[in-house]
Amino acid sequence: MAKILTIVMLVFVSMAGWMFGADTGSIGGITNMRDFQSRYADRYDPVTDTYSYSSARQGLLVGMVNTGTTVGCLLSSPLGDRFGKRKCIMGWTLVYITGVIVQLTTIPSWVQMMVAKIWTGLGIGALSVIAPGYQSESSPPHIRGAIVTTYQLFITLGIFIAACINMGTHKYTTHPEAQWRVPIGINLLWGILMFFGMLFLPESPRYLAVKGRNEECMKILTRNAGLPADHPIMQKEYNAIQADVEAELAGGPCSWPQIFSNEIRYRTLLGMGVMAFQQLTGNNYFFYYGTQVFRGTGLNSPFLAALILDAVNFGCTFGAIFVLEYFGRRGPLIVGGVWQSICFFIYASVGDRALTRPNGTSNHRAGAVMIVFSCLFIFSFAQTWAPAAYVIVGESYPIRYRSKCAAVATASNWFWNFMISFFTPFISNSIGFKYGYVFAACNLCAAIIIFLFAKETKGLTLEEINQLYLSNIKPWNTGAYQRDREDIKQSDSEKERGPTSKLHEYVEHAPNSYASTHSTESENYPQQVTNPVGL
């Protein structure tokens, strides 16, 4: 069993998620604060004494952070390969801190605020790749899913805390600029904690193995697992890492085009698709524009409604730690996609057909129904698509390709994040709550994609996952492999053989087996991959 201290250290890396969540959770409320609007909005109505934004300006203020995050994702890969994940986490945290300082000290120029958000996004985007990758590579297999899930848990905690801060500051009148400067200033604290905390954490053991620092690699593995170096489990894990490193690096450094080669293209596109659909579920429709959306339902306190939604998001994410470890990855993603599609369909139908009365006033009962189904959507999203997307990307790639594949997958996430955050004002102003039908369709498509393409990886080591994807086992049959694997674990003789040979046995007897077309020697690291569903 992993030491408690190791678990705490790995969970601490999820502070990167908190930084991301704090930015996401604060911007929606900040753009609706009067002092901020008086400085950066481009419309003023003297009759009502209110400020408002054009769709373009609001989209840029909210969404441009995601252009920075997309670039940060792509930059994270070469720097992570060269300097290691620990040093890069610290470096990108400094980039984040710098961006927050510029936001905090900006003059009344919306362009300067936008540029500061882009700079902040560079740090957030890079950390969204490196931090879950560090956790995946450093965690013992039996708790890896739970550890990486804490990254999403901390995102939701950051969103919730930011909403609480917004709720407490949006009515400041003595020093009105404190309405939005306090939420932004507090975000500095999370970056500072992250930077100094990383001083006490070790480097990823798999990165050390790649660099030939084998003694340090074994030392960290044994410390993380709480077992001596001569323990059979440690020897098997260490030998598996060494074999994987030697095989994956035999072809030399990985170039960007190679992540779309036959050997890895299937997983590259899967990761990009999963991360894209995590955004296309529509979660950030609520997190970025929740305050504005709920104001449209006629509520007197849209800040409170957004806070309730964020609280549901945070509370339900605790369930994800259990869901992903007990039910795996495929099942929750499929069920979650269908559930979320239903929620958005009802949300859009009520908003489009029942929210506004013939006399133009809001139907508060319809508004309450919309909030309920918004919460039911978040109930599902927080336990399925929110954490599982990061888990899949963090554990699906072999060492040689891992940093670049994770970078392009996460860049896909941030690209669609930008598309939604920027175009939502335009679309909402055009079709109103019918926008929800788009997300309902996307959620249903996401469930189908997972059923057809994603393999079940619960409880496998990173090396076993690599071999599973190299096999011809159909994605919808990998659940059967998991059940067989649990049965095999009951046999003492099979325990002595080690987890890798268990996978080999299943592959040898699987339909359309990979083993039938490859020799035993080449089975571990084949040069050509037959994609199970034709990608």
Curated annotation (Swiss-Prot):
Q: Which CDD domains match?
A: MFS_HXT (cd17356)
Q: A single GO CC term, please?
A: cell division site
UniProt KW Membrane keyword: yes
Query: Compositional bias (Polar residues) spans?
Result: 513-535
Q: How does it sit in the membrane?
A: Multi-pass membrane protein
Subcellular location, record wording: Membrane
Q: Which residues lie on this side of the membrane: Extracellular?
A: 31-58, 109-112, 166-181, 288-303, 352-365, 428-434
Predominant location? membrane
Question: Where is the segment annotated Disordered?
Answer: 484-535
| GO terms (BP aspect) | carbohydrate transmembrane transport; carbohydrate transport; meiotic cell cycle
Cystines in this chain: none
PANTHER family from the entry?
GALACTOSE TRANSPORTER-RELATED (PTHR48022:SF75), PLASTIDIC GLUCOSE TRANSPORTER 4 (PTHR48022)
Q: Which family does it belong to?
A: Belongs to the major facilitator superfamily. Sugar transporter (TC 2.A.1.1) family.
Q: What is this protein called?
A: High-affinity fructose transporter ght6
Origin species:
Schizosaccharomyces pombe (strain 972 / ATCC 24843) (Fission yeast)
Recorded name of the encoding gene: ght6
